Amino acid sequence: MNLKDYIATIENYPKEGVTFRDISPLMADGNAYSYAVREIVQYATDKKIDMVVGPEARGFIVGCPVAFELGIGFAPVRKPGKLPREVISADYEKEYGVDTLTMHADAIKPGQRVLIVDDLLATGGTVKATIEMIERLGGIVAGCAFLIELDELKGREVIGEYDYKVLMHY
């Protein structure tokens, strides 16, 4: 199945000069959505994953069904002020400044093998901050999986030695 057939391309969104890749059509098609989830589950199967972690918001959309299929838990990564209990945080660079991500301080137990799942790998800032928090909690990042990678933004360089899978390249 060619998953790119289920990605809408919107020029100049959310601002002039940006090409937005919208995964909504993929999610709206049960066969395509299921296929994408199964591809990530297959990647994760041999990695002995204990927990899936996904950054808001689209990391939830992809990560939760992966965790469900693997029969394991899911831990959300959110912006500050969105999680009700004690959190840890990590800053990351954005185009026009610094932003912060958080996760519950008890989300990952030391030694747990974690799969990070998100819809998009662009500059790598989100995944870098997520890796930092997982490792601070004693987790092992066993892999990362993305629906889409925007190759020209070089996010793979940020991932470095971590294993990862991408379903579509743009």
Swiss-Prot record:
The keyword rRNA-binding does not apply. Its EC number is 2.4.2.7. It is found in: Cytoplasm. Gene3D superfamilies: 3.40.50.2020. It holds the Pfam family Pribosyltran. Belongs to the purine/pyrimidine phosphoribosyltransferase family. One of its GO terms (molecular function) is adenine binding. Catalyzes a salvage reaction resulting in the formation of AMP, that is energically less costly than de novo synthesis. Signal peptide: none annotated. Pathway: Purine metabolism; AMP biosynthesis via salvage pathway; AMP from adenine: step 1/1. GO terms for biological process: adenine salvage; AMP salvage; purine ribonucleoside salvage. Homodimer. NCBIfam families: apt, PRK02304.1-2, PRK02304.1-3, PRK02304.1-5. HAMAP family: Aden_phosphoribosyltr (MF_00004). This is Adenine phosphoribosyltransferase. Keywords: Cytoplasm, Glycosyltransferase, Purine salvage, Transferase. It comes from the Bacteria. It comes from Streptococcus gordonii (strain Challis / ATCC 35105 / BCRC 15272 / CH1 / DL1 / V288).
